[in-house]
């Protein structure tokens, strides 16, 4: 393998809200800048990026107590847009042309998601940040990531998590948990592993979308994975 050439041309990067969470606020702009610098390095090698960002640093629907689930999920969608605009602003400051596209129309500060427009932006060197998930309740941003990946023809979904791989159990609770380097969609579902929600896993399996789960404790991990480093967990078909 040519270690100077990226393994993937078009990537859907899923960032959790926790990944960009600040200790003294909801956003860590210094860390977002580090992410931008790494994306720029990848883009200089011809890599195209679509990004789905979660909202866990601001709001989680399941934390809404007795709140109506649909309303709670609507709040989550709005929170993803706050994160998306924050990413866009930081990327632009770092010299990256970025556009926010949302599943729910918010024309004052984002473009509506249109598949062909998103692909045109990618082909023209822009990072496309998808807000509002899929625009419907009861659907996670993990599921939104694999759906958008299918729509834009991404080579891989990079799931940047606050844990460095998929394990046989939660390593924070079970000291005997073992890291998994490669696993199939069916195995994840059969073993009930909490790598991502089952809807996202099933959709990825049905549409043969490869997923690479890795830790974002170091932003350089994005570059390393794209360049073919063996780290984290690769999820794919049989």
Model-derived segments and their meaning:
Residues 1-238:
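C-terminal catalytic "cap/lid" subdomain
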């Amino acid at each position: 393998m040519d270690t100077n050439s990226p393994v993937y041309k078009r990537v859907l990067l899923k960032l959790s809200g926790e990944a960009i969470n600040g200790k003294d606020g909801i956003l860590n702009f210094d860390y977002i800048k580090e992410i931008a610098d790494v994306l720029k390095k990848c883009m200089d090698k011809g890599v195209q990026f679509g990004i789905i960002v979660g909202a866990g640093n601001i709001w989680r629907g399941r934390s809404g107590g007795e709140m109506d689930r649909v309303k709670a999920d609507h709040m989550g969608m709005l929170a993803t847009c706050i994160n998306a605009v924050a990413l866009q602003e930081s990327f632009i400051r770092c010299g990256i042309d970025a556009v926010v596209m949302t599943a729910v129309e918010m024309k004052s500060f984002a473009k509506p998601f249109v598949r062909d427009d998103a692909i045109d932006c990618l082909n023209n060197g822009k990072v496309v940040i998808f807000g509002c998930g899929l625009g419907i309740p009861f659907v996670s941003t993990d599921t939104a990531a694999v759906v958008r990946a299918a729509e834009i023809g991404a080579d891989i979904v990079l799931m940047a998590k606050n844990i460095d791989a998929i394990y046989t159990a939660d390593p924070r609770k079970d000291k005997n948990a073992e890291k998994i380097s490669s696993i199939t969609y069916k195995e994840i579902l059969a073993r009930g592993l909490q790598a991502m929600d089952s809807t996202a896993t099933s959709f990825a399996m049905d549409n043969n979308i490869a997923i690479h789960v890795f830790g974002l404790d170091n932003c350089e991990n994005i570059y390393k994975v794209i360049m073919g480093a063996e780290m984290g967990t690769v999820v794919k078909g049989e």
